[in-house]
Amino acid sequence: MTTVNAPEFVRHPKLIAWVEEIANLTKPAKIEWCDGSEEEYQRLIDLMIANGTMQKLNQEKHPGSYLANSDPSDVARVEDRTYICSQNKEDAGATNNWEDPAVMREKLNGLFEGSMKGRTMYVVPFSMGPLGSHIAHIGIELTDSPYVAVSMRKMARMGKAVYDVLGTDGEFVPCVHTVGAPLAEGQKDVAWPCNPEKYIVHYPETREIWSFGSGYGGNALLGKKCLALRIASVMGREQGWLAEHMLILGVTNPQGEKHYIAAAFPSACGKTNFAMLIPPAGYEGWKIETVGDDIAWIKPGEDGRLYAINPEAGFFGVAPGTNTKTNPNCMATLHKDVIYTNVAVTDDGQVWWEGLSKEVPANLTNWKGQPHVNGEKAAHPNARFTVAAGQCPSIDADWENPAGVPISAFIFGGRRADTVPLVSEAFDWVDGVYKAATMGSETTAAAVGQQGIVRRDPFAMLPFAGYNMADYFDHWLNLGAKVSEKAEASGNKLPKIFNVNWFRRDAEGNFVWPGFGQNMRVLEWIIDRCEGRANAVETPIGFVPTYEDLNWEGTEFTKEQFDLITNQDRDQWVTEIESHTELFNKLGERLPKALKERQAALLEAVKTGF
């Protein structure tokens, strides 16, 4: 039997008993209680270098930075192996995979039995959100992966201080993770242990997360998507708040007015770039600051405003396509202390990925550890960097404010080659919820499967909602109604809701909108709409700006180009709105009536209004 030996700073009997229970099941060779110290971090890094899991990069060019290359079978989230095991199948809904919790527990008990043999179990305490914030929640992850332990130190508030907040009886979300590769005595380990069989399982009622077989970020860093979205969305519904797949940014104009915006885009649609946007020429005196690039927890305040925190402490960003032109702030964030995964490396120990430079360096080693062959990808399309958010030059002064920051507007956007205009404002909260509920995006490399097909991704939460999607829509509608009453009483108003699409293409298939820093022009219009300053034209699908309503100083983007990405085609929109029925039918009886009514009204407006 493995000895638990909890250190003095752990004073929580229930937690200690749980660690003992999991140790008896998984049978690790030893248990290590992580304290989050620099010494511990370096020791685990050195251990992984010795094991071949990580390599030290050129310390002049990449001080404190390391590279891990995963097994080629373990490179992305595995949505088809991700389960919501609610007691009642209906509570998981048609967009989630469900298994009876009793059946799943039996299955997982079999898989986890002895799964950590020959390995160390790391007890990783973490807070999602600033320590002690009323919006924050604590998790404890038990993992046999040192890669997870060091990554969690960057991605969450990880360490001894968590136990001070937890005390002797504080609540925590129990997270169990194994790579599913036990070692027999004397057996040599591989560089990236994993198992062909993978399960990422959530039990919403008991707030448990169990992950088997994968060492990759989203499947193994259980504070991220598993706790911060799937479990937290269930908690939010019960407690009256939102857990969302959203970036949060602050915008300050030259007059010193500041607004915070939360924006939801599916994975690999530019959340990190937008969160770290640098205003273009013509926007001197404007400032964009970053609160978060991926997840927002949003709670109603007493004044009827919605306040958001970034529950994470780091960025787990997609490397390919990131460079000093597309995201200078991100590149500056990567100046030191980064864990890279599945990027390529030069012969002098510098990282490289597609899009970092036009020229492909000579003598490159690809993400599989082999010499790079021209015409093949040197870095995996879903290669990642893990870095502390505090290193970002555009980080907002209030990014760790335990009270959160007040949200003025929500933006929703997907990757669409046609139909959806550059920007539109919803008529009201219900209309905005409808647009977010039916947003579509072309699939990307962040999830396993086919690329380039339009799929409905409601609120960019399709892979992340921890309960029935129809109930999730209902929660948004109800929250809006409740907060609206409170806001009016305090002289405030609900955030406005906008849709954007940076990805319209011309007849030749090229992107028309330059994107990146130029998205500031759309952002300025959005803020001015929140302030009641900007003009717009009412169309059947919302309020849209004319060419003259946007600020074009410092650019030569023409009216003809603008018309290409804002024109609305009646037939395309009829097809679009009719195609929403497929999602609505899938969601069945629980779909809020207000959304069916909105669809009918929108279809009528589009048929007669264009």
Curated annotation (Swiss-Prot):
Q: Which cofactor does it need?
A: Mn(2+)
Domain of life according to the entry: Bacteria
An example Gene Ontology biological process: glycerol biosynthetic process from pyruvate
A cellular-component GO term for this protein = cytosol
What EC number(s) does this enzyme carry?
A: 4.1.1.32
State the pathway, as annotated in the record.
Carbohydrate biosynthesis; gluconeogenesis
User: What is the designated name of this protein?
Assistant: Phosphoenolpyruvate carboxykinase [GTP]
